[in-house]
Amino acid sequence: MKKELILKALKLRDMGFPSGDIAEELNISVKTALYLTLNGEELLKAGETPKEDSEKLDIFLEWDNVRASSRRLRNISKIICDMLSDVEFDGIVGISSGGVPLATLISDELDKNFSIYVPKKHVHTEKEKTTGFIGQNMSSIVGKDVIIVDDVMTSGNSVKETIKYLKGIANPKKVFVVMDKSGIDEIDGVRIEHLFRTGVVDIKK
């Protein structure tokens, strides 16, 4: 496992970030983030991932050179706008936090209503049961056709949660992500579109 990734996870943990936020920041699954924060020091000492965990694979995606630049993000958003040319919709929902910058740029480019969905993994509460929520401009999407935007889809849990929530107040038509790690094409009848998709190929000698 990449040493740099382990060090980043431990640094975020020490800064007080919960596993969900670490996963979001590093574009890894929540399970991987939890594993790194609990076992990071031992992994660094060992110099490699323990053998018993060698079959548990996750893919680390880093696109800081893109998301750190508003110009580059706008270029990505224009690609998504082109993919949206045959979709009729009224509003855009960005999944917090990674999908918000892109959703903002797309809504500006297409002059569409904009809203934010905050998944439950970002809701810090002591309650055992919690849900995500629409964090901005909810009234603009109620009863409307909407598309959902996120940067990276790892397990699909946040997207599935967002779709389920929005189906109670609106009509989600499609999901657009920059990078898909899940291999999922559809969730609850809603099509998932991606710019890039990753996968693991098992090559046996």
UniProtKB/Swiss-Prot annotation:
The keyword Transcription regulation applies. Gene3D superfamilies: 3.40.50.2020. Pfam families: Pribosyltran. InterPro entries: GfcR-like (IPR022854), PRibTrfase_dom (IPR000836), PRTase-like (IPR029057). Keywords: DNA-binding, Transcription, Transcription regulation. GO terms for biological process: pyrimidine nucleobase biosynthetic process; regulation of gene expression; UMP biosynthetic process. The keyword Methyltransferase does not apply. Disulfide bonds: none annotated. Signal peptide: none annotated. GO terms for molecular function: DNA binding; orotate phosphoribosyltransferase activity. SUPFAM superfamilies: PRTase-like. Contains an N-terminal DNA-binding winged helix-turn-helix domain and a C-terminal regulatory domain (or effector binding domain) resembling phosphoribosyltransferase (PRT) domain. NCBIfam families: PRK02277.1 (NF002620). Belongs to the purine/pyrimidine phosphoribosyltransferase family. GfcR subfamily. This is Transcriptional regulator GfcR.
